[in-house]
Amino acid sequence: MKMFKSLSLIPRIVSPFQKCYSTDLISLVGVPRVKITKGQNRYLLVNIHTHGFTKYGRVIVRGADVDNHLAIFDSILEELEPEGICAKILGGGRILNEPDNKKIKIYGTSRTFGGADHTRTRNILQAWTTYKDFKITVKQ
């Protein structure tokens, strides 16, 4: 009888772990690490996490041809909030993406969010399959 009582506690013990490591982690991993457009763009380096469920986040790069970095942040929130994912801006700058020449130049800073770690941005881009053959230069 004691064994059955002990076994009845298993779902209560397993449920939080199952919720933490399945649904939320899958939604976090399902977010593409890089989304930048062709040409000269502003970009943001963003740490994303599932609030309350994941201990560590994932760093993503988002860039677009917009007037300011705040517009990029608004589009990030529109993309991630329905999934329950929180975003923290690590900084921003500019990216010159020339896919025809296979070159990317990362430089500058964001007036709104401050400067991003361009070396970290370069490493993320090089790890992404689309940009692994590109020559990526960083100017601080």
Swiss-Prot record:
Keyword terms of this UniProt record: Differentiation, Sexual differentiation
Cross-referenced Pfam families: Ocnus
Effect caused by changing residue 27 to N: In strain: Port-Louis
Coiled coil regions in record: none
Binding residue positions for substrate: 42, 110-112
One MF term in the entry's GO annotations: protein histidine phosphatase activity
Gene Ontology annotations of biological process type: cell differentiation; sex differentiation
Entries under Gene3D superfamilies matching the protein: Janus/Ocnus
Active site per database record: 69 (proton acceptor)
Keyword Hydrolase recorded: no
Any Gene Ontology CC annotation: cytosol
Effect caused by changing residue 72 to V: In strain: 1631
Function summary: JanA and janB regulate somatic sex differentiation.
Protein family per UniProt: Belongs to the janus family.
Protein name, as recorded: Sex-regulated protein janus-B
